[in-house]
Amino acid sequence: MAKIGLFFGSNTGKTRKVAKSIKKRFDDETMSDALNVNRVSAEDFAQYQFLILGTPTLGEGELPGLSSDCENESWEEFLPKIEGLDFSGKTVALFGLGDQVGYPENYLDALGELYSFFKDRGAKIVGSWSTDGYEFESSEAVVDGKFVGLALDLDNQSGKTDERVAAWLAQIAPEFGLSL
């Protein structure tokens, strides 16, 4: 079994694309395939000691799911399935996609929601990211002046995505016992 579980929720496929680009940097012994949370069980998810989780922020700051007009279930429906799990001793890194120009008042709020969910259940959250280079009004994903995970804006800053992903993975690798 792979050491790191890589899971995402997606509506348009952008978060899936980023998850797959993360996976390409690791072999199968190190990281699972990029797995959509609408296709896994709580047991699949819970078996990993290390997790990398991705989400877009939809509409007015929502997680993807049926109530935010997604065609398929996503994080909104998956989180209740794992809310009884204890994540103490697990290390979690988060990445989020959002549109800082179109939705500056709730940029990456869904990332903040994932952060709170896993932190409240004992997970060690790693991979905070600087807010430098972003222009937004507010975000639930900012704690102590930094994003709680990798912040990506494929709508307005797609040219920075590969560089940001590489730098973030280098930052979190030691937390997962890896070297890049």
UniProtKB/Swiss-Prot annotation:
**Family statement drawn from the similarity comment of this UniProt entry:** Belongs to the flavodoxin family.
Q: So what does this one do?
A: Flavodoxins are low-potential electron donors to a number of redox enzymes. NifF is the electron donor to nitrogenase, and is thus implicated in nitrogen fixation. Does not function as an electron donor to nitrite reductase.
- Output the NCBIfam families linked to this UniProt entry: flav_long, PRK09267.1-4, PRK09267.1-5
Domain Flavodoxin-like: from-to ranges: 4-173
Name the species this protein comes from.
Azotobacter vinelandii
The conditions that induce or repress this protein are given as:
Is the predominant flavodoxin expressed when A.vinelandii is grown on N(2) as nitrogen source. Is also synthesized during growth on nitrate, but in less abundance than AvFld 1.
Protein name per the record: Flavodoxin 2
Which cofactor does the UniProt annotation name? FMN
Which keywords, in A-to-Z order, does the entry hold? Electron transport, Flavoprotein, FMN, Nitrogen fixation, Transport
Could you tell me the superkingdom of the organism this chain comes from? Bacteria
